[in-house]
Curated annotation (Swiss-Prot):
Record keywords: ATP-binding, Cytoplasm, DNA damage, DNA repair, DNA replication, DNA-binding, Nucleotide-binding, SOS response
Domain of life assignment: Bacteria
Gene Ontology MF, one: ATP binding
Gene source species: Rickettsia typhi (strain ATCC VR-144 / Wilmington)
Gene Ontology biological process: DNA replication; DNA synthesis involved in DNA repair; double-strand break repair; SOS response
Keyword Lipid metabolism applies: no
HAMAP family assigned to the protein according to its UniProt record, in alphabetical order: RecF (MF_00365)
Descriptive protein name: DNA replication and repair protein RecF
Length: 360
């Protein structure tokens, strides 16, 4: 079993922090402090060492401390490839983020080769009533823990889709290049769709096997390509190539690609009630989301033999005693580095006795 965890974390000019240095152990860490003290900012800084834009999906210019030209996050991290120095650096005027692994630049989408991470924030509780784009990104972030190349594939797909849209918009008469682009999109789409379906299968198995204090969910993906894979209807790659070819005129008028894996939606149902999570109460939605995160942790550890870093922002708020106790027991048994934010320790005193407390 490989444990992914931080040994140290340094923030410079990061949001409300001028300088912050933390030395931590591979145990649960509880960040306490008043609202506005920067607890979630620390979780966000850690999440930057995983593919994407962090747990807030913030603009880079919002991350730097007001009036400062740059910000930097450094971490000494026990990674999949051993202990290593990681850093990410943002210059306000360039609106670019540079990430380094042992002083060598790496692409953001390469981070899943080194780290494994799961997080849950209050903002995510609206995921079921949000856009299909948000749900799809949520699913893809889960996939990163099972396939380290998934983020890179998504970036390549976006690149080829942008190129296709550009060729169609500018009426470039280069059918050979367009054909190559659509073939690349089709091949990548097939892999991405299969990755998503495989991950949903892993997650569903974990949900069905585990009895806990949270409602069980049925997971599925609503997408033409994924559905054809499930039905084993035909040569998927050829089907995608044909669809892209046949929608060229339509897409030229629309100015976008109207067909593809970027249109799929991640669907979640309350298993017992047999209704989509978006129709459940807000309390039920939060409980279902927690159940999905627990399944993600269990399936990731079981199938990859890697324990991710877990980031939880105010997770214990509005939970009843039974569910709160279940989570504390679950986290303790996992033997992972867990970061939890809380304004105070009310109701989690016993859990706090086994954790590293950091008061801001």
């Amino acid at each position: 079993m490989k444990n992914i965890f931080l040994h140290s974390l340094n923030l410079e000019n990061y949001r409300n922090f001028k300088n912050l240095e933390l030395k931590i152990d591979n145990i649960p860490i509880i960040l306490t402090g008043e609202n506005g003290s920067g607890k979630t900012n620390i979780l966000e800084a850690i999440s930057l060492f995983y593919p994407g834009r962090g747990l807030r999906s913030s603009k880079l210019t919002d991350i730097c401390k007001t009036s400062e030209d740059y910000c930097r996050v450094k971490a000494l991290l026990q990674s999949k490839l051993g202990i290593a120095d990681f850093s990410t650096h943002i210059k306000r005027n360039s609106n670019r983020r540079i990430t380094e692994y042992n002083a060598s630049k790496i692409a953001n989408n390469e981070l899943s080769k080194f780290t494994s991470m799961v997080w849950l924030t209050p903002q995510m509780e609206g995921i079921f009533t949000s856009s299909s784009t948000d749900r799809r990104k949520f699913l893809d972030r889960i996939v990163y823990n099972f396939d380290t190349k998934h983020a890179e594939l998504l970036n390549k797909y976006e690149y080829y889709m942008h190129e296709r849209n550009k060729i169609l918009a500018e009426d470039i008469r280069d059918n050979n290049w367009l054909k190559i682009i659509e073939e690349n999109m089709a091949n990548i789409s097939n892999i991405i769709a299969n990755n998503r379906l495989k991950t949903i299968r892993f997650m569903q198995q974990a949900i069905d096997e585990i009895e806990n204090e949270f409602p069980k969910a049925d997971l599925s993906i609503d997408g033409i390509i994924e559905q054809k894979i499930l039905n084993v209807e035909e040569d998927i790659v050829s089907f995608i190539i044909t669809e892209l070819y046949q929608t060229r005129s339509k897409d030229k008028l629309l100015g976008r690609t109207s067909f593809g894996i970027h249109k799929s939606d991640f669907l979640v149902k309350h298993q017992k009630k047999n209704i989509l999570a978006k129709f459940c109460s807000t309390g039920e939605q939060k409980a279902i989301l927690i159940a999905i995160i627990l399944a993600e942790m269990n399936s990731t550890i079981k199938l990859t033999k890697i324990t991710p870093i877990l980031l939880l922002d105010e997770i214990f708020v509005h939970l009843d005693d039974k569910r709160r106790q279940y989570l504390m027991d679950f986290f303790t048994a996992l033997n992972i580095q867990l970061w939890v934010t809380a304004t105070n320790l009310d109701g989690i005193e016993n859990f706090a006795n086994k954790a590293q407390l950091i008061k801001l």
